[in-house]
């Protein structure tokens, strides 16, 4: 049970959501077999890698007040038990991915490589840009969901993945601001810890522009997602105003508000991704 807690159920649900959205956006059917296998891949691969990440970071978790209650630092689970549980989840997830097709298995392998050895073990304690490698791991469920439906990964899948990738800085950096004393105490050089608030705001804005460009480009390429984009754009503009104001106030409440705005923006954009819009109807009529 504690191993399942280590999968970060809320984060797992969000990443699994991106996988299923990509699956249906790619034209995936309601096949119980594929949908069931994708669920096993999500729980096993995403959840297992997340749990393994907690094993690798258990020393940091013990230092930071925000994470000190997690199963390993709180003593509810030994490091060895957590490691075994994580590896079992990953093995099951990878086996399900291999049953679907080799591309889905590849996305799982890449998620593991980018998340554990590259992000967590190599860069997180050394570099402020470590989340870029973590972000690559974060887009793999989207690519895996698309590959589950089609057996291939094309431009639309990469545009959806780019939206997830460019959403991650707003999601992560403002969590860091909210708990910045924890990160300083643990000696983790996240970008908000070592850079000026103005630099972080500019960088976050650049990524937000990429997110908007990628979701709107997805609509132009596929004719899908217009309603989601129309609803998501004003939320992003509102978030942008808060981000640009943040350096003036450096307020924890505002940091939390920005972080909480990030998730709905991505959710709304992705909810519309599988659905055709008048754009595709107009193109059909003009042919």
Show where each model-derived region lies.
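Small-residue-rich segments of transmembrane alpha-helices in multi-pass membrane proteins
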Residues: 14-20, 70-73, 132-149, 198, ...
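Membrane-embedded alpha-helical segments that form the functional core of polytopic membrane enzymes
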Residues: 17-58, 65-66, 90-94, 105-117, ...
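Cytosolic, membrane-interface loops and tails of multi-pass inner-membrane proteins
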Residues: 56-77, 173-201
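C-terminal ends of transmembrane helices
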Residues: 59, 114-128, 172-178, 240-250
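Multi-pass membrane catalytic core of lipid/isoprenoid biosynthesis enzymes
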Residues: 66-106, 196-220
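Interfacial loop-to-transmembrane junctions
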Residues: 78, 240-268
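Intramembrane alpha-helical segments
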Residues: 79-149
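Juxtamembrane boundary at the C-terminal end of a transmembrane helix
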Residues: 271-287
